[in-house]
Amino acid sequence: MIFSILEHILTHISFSVVSIVLTIYFLTLLVNLDEIIGFFDSSDKGIIITFFCITGLLFTRWIYSGHFPLSNLYESLIFLSWSFSIIHMVSYFNKKQQNHLNAITAPSAIFIQGFATSGLLNKMPQSAILVPALQSQWLMMHVSMMILGYGALLCGSLLSIALLVITFRKVGPTFWKKNIKKKFLLNELFSFDVLYYINERNSILLQQNINFSFSRNYYRYQLIQQLDFWSFRIISLGFIFLTVGILSGAVWANETWGSYWNWDPKETWAFITWTIFAIYLHIKTNRNVRDINSAIVASIGFLLIWICYFGVNLLGIGLHSYGSFTSN
């Protein structure tokens, strides 16, 4: 009874804190409150509080249930939210350079935890005895590595998606302006009055706009470089976790079912996901390939992760259907 109450309290505290953090962060984006009262630093500290609350929640559930809390979808979602808070803390304690990981980790943590604690999963929060197939020491190794891999790959993929948005936003208006300018010059090619006006206008506005344009383009370039920097490193870390998780799962499957690989739906999609991110890392090793190409591959990987993570749970089929929606 005490453990249930403590788990309930920690769940609501962590969700409330991360909700406040997300609100503060969006306020800093809109009105730049961080320069006034330091709200931005407060939001980072809020994520740290959330991390300790979720850690306490997982330990409480571990002690109460007697097994590592990764036996159903609810527990895996809480663990996934915990992994996002870890990534946020790494970016928080890295004071050498400014990064924008908190724009990804804070919303991801609140959405995942909000879904886990919503009414959709109202039957899952109750801890249950493990089915015989899950009563193994490999549970902690395999599932924790897979969830950590999912968290890191999702975060890195979201950074790549942000890179694509900023890049295409940069290319689009530039292309439009070039075409409009070309049409204007062709139509007014022999209008010396218009040409004189353009020259005069450019000479007046040049000094006013050059500093602003340079600083804006430089900031955008720096932002794209930071997104690519963090995306590559976080995806690399997630790829390692995913690889270890797949290998440990193969060993566990051999002990349980007598075969290392059965082409189960979960195994198949995990292999497809692993292949996509292997292609991403291979592209990153080629310096002649633009960053936008690798970002597109990572964006595809983002969709595959959710298919791999939720696909079996939605269908409730295969050897990995424990804790699925339909099983409840």
From Swiss-Prot:
Keyword hit for ATP-binding: no
Keywords: Chloroplast, Cytochrome c-type biogenesis, Membrane, Plastid, Thylakoid, Transmembrane, Transmembrane helix
Membrane topology note: Multi-pass membrane protein
Molecular functions (GO terms): heme binding
Main location: plastid
Location(s), subcellular: Plastid, Chloroplast thylakoid membrane
One family name in Pfam for this protein: Cytochrom_C_asm
One Gene Ontology biological process: cytochrome complex assembly
UniProt function note: Required during biogenesis of c-type cytochromes (cytochrome c6 and cytochrome f) at the step of heme attachment.
UniProt protein name: Cytochrome c biogenesis protein CcsA
Organism of this sequence: Capsella bursa-pastoris (Shepherd's purse)
Lineage, uppermost ranks: Eukaryota, Viridiplantae, Streptophyta, Embryophyta, Tracheophyta
Gene for this chain: ccsA
